Amino acid sequence: MEISSSPWNDGGYSPYERNRVAVSPFSSALEGEERIETSRSLGDHCFEPLPYVTNYLSIFALFGKEIFGDKGNVSSRNEYLLKKYYSLKKPFVLRHNGHALKNPDMPLQRNDILQTNFMVDKFLNRTVRSVNFNNFKIISDMQSKSGRGTKSGTNQNQSADAIQNICLPSIPSALPYFQYYRKLLTVNTKEWDILKLHSLWVPKLRKDFKDFSLYGDKNSLKPIDSHYDEDNTMKKNLFFERSPSRQTLDGKGCASKGYDISSGNMIIPSLFSEDKLPALTYHCSVELNGNIYIFGGLMPCYSYEEDAPMLNDFFVDGIKNLPPPLLPQVINNPSMVNNPHLYVASIPSCRFSKPKMGGYIPPPLLCVQGSKLTDRHIFFYGGFEIRTETRGDENGKYHLKKRLYVNNTGYILDIMSFKFTKIDIIVQPSKYNAYPTMSSRFGHLQISIDNPNRRASVHSSSMNEIHKMGSASMKQGSSITSGRLEKAAVLSSLPHNTVHTVIIFGGYRQTGDDRYEAMNDLWKIEIPVIRRGKKGYCKFSETANAILLTPSEKDKSDWPEERAFSAFSVHGTSLMDRSSLDMRLLNNLKNHFVLKPSYISQDRVVSPKPVFPMMVHGTHQDLFNSGSAAQESPKAGASASSASAASFDPDMDDNLENYIVNPGRKSSSIPMTAIGRQRLILSQEKPVGKTVVLHGGSNGLNVLDDMWLMDLECETWTPIETFAKADSSEDGDEKLDSVNVGLVGHRMESIGRICVCIGGMVQEDVDQFYSENDDEPPRKRKVDTLPLGGNFLNTIDLSTQCWEEHKITLSKKEDDEDRQDSENEDTNSNIVVGVGGTSLQCDKSIILIGGLISRRSNVKEIYLHGTITKSIFPSVNPSA
């Protein structure tokens, strides 16, 4: 039985007809269309498709045409589809029957959007071909017998003999999946789409790349002797192993022989999905409830490197003066198309899906930022859209004109219905600026603030007065005059149960054609909630209020300079406390614990209600002196309390009002030291503060290297000096040198007090990427020299403010190379540079999705990272 579900029916074109490759979708000229006489009048930038360094491969594709049959010339098909894709992007004058559009920002018509999305689906539809289930069953039987170590029988038919004579790969780790998939074949053949959901995608590595290594070793290059074997090198690899004769990973080689669970690792998980994960770059990823929601970005029009189309017929007038880390050779590449879809990845279950979106769907955006509003909603803001106009000439050439349009609209995604809601940002006027404006931006900082006051909690009178003062001053439109920020702007001007707050800082704005300017303005966006429902449903207002937060004149020096594409993460303020442990514990007891008034009054409570009735220690009785405590006189108890108070720090007796739970109730209060074994209750007077760590970024081609802390409670900035451990001196004392690590386009994740900076460019990389001479050879550094921040992983300990060195290298095996002069080689030549990807924390790991990778020895040779990488960092600092 053979079921055919071929997707090649696209208007009569067949990829097997080689003489149809040069056919142009512009063959029938539209009325009023202008032809181009010279082939290089609009652009002369020719591009090449980007290769893959990691990618996902269907497990059925390992057997090639034995299961799927001949796939044909996919490269020619993709070239035709790419020309058809750009033929839909005609100039606006031609799209509307000759009526010129005065507004270039007018969005595309719905019909154009549907046609464009249809063509993108054609690019992604790669593995749905004719499946020969008879051959699949035979191969499955052969894999099963090979896994048990038995030989195939001699009573097979001719088809089985023909397949057996072919050298098929033996994958023991895939045997359970083959057995599982055979059971799925018992379903009704009319429901073929069900089987697509159970397709398994396994990671694939590039041939000339061997392994990843979490920590680089300067002594990794050593002479070969008789005692040197492959096992010695594999003990240092903490990621995965691959057989030298194969391109795919085997289940037995996922961990090296010398693997230590406390040293951390990095793996590429396989995925169950109907669709292949595209190699996205400059996209947005948000983690919510254990799932990762991926939106926007660019993706290649080919799923595999061998399917890449020829780009000789495309000439691009691209976007100029792009700031780092936006690479012109990627943004302007005609093989990189906009991603119009939303993807959902579940890391614990290794599931990947492409849901159908609804509502006010935003355009394909690059460098858009997303943040969590509620457990059900995600807020997207900023980014930019790339719009392309296409013209054809008499020679069948395609001249593309790409332009950048910055987005200034917010969108809220409901993850249960996958519907988008459009939010317009309205700036609140003040007495200093009656008509303020908020510039459209990309590459900005965006953080959602979880306001704990939305829940019922105990507030002190001072906090209530601050709320009243803040609301009154906001109504008067007063500006920021006291402190570094205006106190009224710290608190929300709307009720806490009807508003969600988002903080936005910096980014690039567009000041003209191909001109961009960095900013350092700080905004607070308040998104009102009109109605709430079951299961976390919220109906948001169509408009959101934006409040500008500016520093005072005397504190402008304590404010970060203009920047964009900086890294940031959120930490608790307690991480920056330098006091000793005992003092922190005492201060915590003093500030957050009070005595319940009923238990320190003159009349003892006869039968108190237990906190935990099922536990012995849950009662309020003195279990240590139960017999004598009941007969103890109040006077003795009072004297004991006073004696205990006198024996401790007398400074704690000064502020007695801090221990009063309810000012309206008559009750006595005593210092914290006199509590003894009485019951303590936690005071919810003050919410836990949060601190935003901001590092690096760029202002044009200048890479910044400073680090700042922002207190979200007070909304104040504080510069932080960073250090690096220097070589030990002769007396054995360790020295610290004050250093600044400059990075742009990197990501930051927090693990306790450790900040992990992932990827990014240093100033040296920016100088090479954005040099005017593209043919300039890469600069050669001195041996064993690496710029600060040149590693793929850079970590800093916030408690010591010290940078630590970690590396991810791509090691290339060279069997026939003499290593006698290895000391003269650059040991850092295989360290990688990564930009354009996203990182987030999910499933107790750091997840890396997509992006671009290149070797530091040749940064202009860019590769696509088309997989999801899961990183588990060491539980113990190896340098400690």
UniProtKB/Swiss-Prot annotation:
The keyword Repeat applies. Keywords: Cytoplasm, Kelch repeat, Mitochondrion, Phosphoprotein, Repeat, Transducer. Changing residue 221 to P: In strain: Sigma 1278B. One of its GO terms (cellular component) is plasma membrane. InterPro entries: Gal_Oxase/kelch_b-propeller, Kelch-typ_b-propeller. Residues 624-649 are annotated as: Disordered. Changing residue 215 to H: In strain: Sigma 1278B. It is found in: Cytoplasm; Mitochondrion. The modification Phosphoserine is found at residue 24. Residues 638-647 have a biased composition (Low complexity). GO terms for biological process: ascospore formation; glucose mediated signaling pathway; invasive growth in response to glucose limitation; negative regulation of Ras protein signal transduction; pseudohyphal growth. The keyword Mitochondrion applies. GO terms for molecular function: cAMP-dependent protein kinase inhibitor activity; GTPase activating protein binding. Kelch repeats lie at residues 291-339, 377-425, 501-552, 691-738. It comes from the Eukaryota. Its main location: cytoplasm. G proteins are composed of 3 units, alpha, beta and gamma. GPB1 interacts with the alpha subunit GPA2. Beta subunit of a guanine nucleotide-binding protein (G protein). G proteins are involved as modulators or transducers in various transmembrane signaling systems. The beta and gamma chains are required for the GTPase activity, for replacement of GDP by GTP, and for G protein-effector interaction. Involved in the determination of the cAMP level according to nutritional conditions, most probably as a regulator of cAMP phosphodiesterase. Required for the control of pseudohyphal and haploid invasive growth. This is Guanine nucleotide-binding protein subunit beta 2. It comes from Saccharomyces cerevisiae (strain ATCC 204508 / S288c) (Baker's yeast). The lineage of its organism: Eukaryota, Fungi, Dikarya, Ascomycota, Saccharomycotina.
